[in-house]
UniProtKB/Swiss-Prot annotation:
InterPro entries: Ribosomal_uS7, Ribosomal_uS7_bac/org-type, Ribosomal_uS7_CS, Ribosomal_uS7_dom, Ribosomal_uS7_dom_sf. PANTHER family: RIBOSOMAL PROTEIN S7 (PTHR11205). Belongs to the universal ribosomal protein uS7 family. GO terms for molecular function: rRNA binding; structural constituent of ribosome; tRNA binding. GO terms for biological process: translation. Pfam families: Ribosomal_S7. One of the primary rRNA binding proteins, it binds directly to 16S rRNA where it nucleates assembly of the head domain of the 30S subunit. Is located at the subunit interface close to the decoding center, probably blocks exit of the E-site tRNA. Part of the 30S ribosomal subunit. Contacts proteins S9 and S11. This is Small ribosomal subunit protein uS7. GO terms for cellular component: small ribosomal subunit. Signal peptide: none annotated.
Amino acid sequence: MRRKAASKRLTLTDQRFNDEIIYRLINAVMIDGKKSVATKVVYDAMDIVGEKSEESALDVFHKAMTNISPVVEVRGKRVGGATYQIPMEVRAERRVALALRWLKKYSESRSGKSMATRLAAEILDASNSQGSAVKKREEVHKMAEANKAFSHFRF
């Protein structure tokens, strides 16, 4: 018999922007528990974003997150010995988690001096619907569209 589902923990907010998603980005960027370093990287990146765009850094970041977040994804399901890629809608929490993961991954793979400049460049590109993270989202959506025929196999 299944136990009760774990309750969602309260997400804290960061000090400067008072935003939950920025706090989660700081945690995603953090390496070896060095939160102060991660905080500095994210805040420096946000400063660069603020300088390079007319809008506020937070607005640009949220626009970028919207452009990166996937709406549908494919998940594998075994049916009679064959594994089908079934398109599924992505839950809101997973959407943010995937967007943050892709933002970090493709920022790291960029060429540039500091992580702050690479992160800022990826955020600016994503807010303009460009960059590797947006490309990844389009790729995921394309896979879901290609496997639309299997959407009747629900979980």
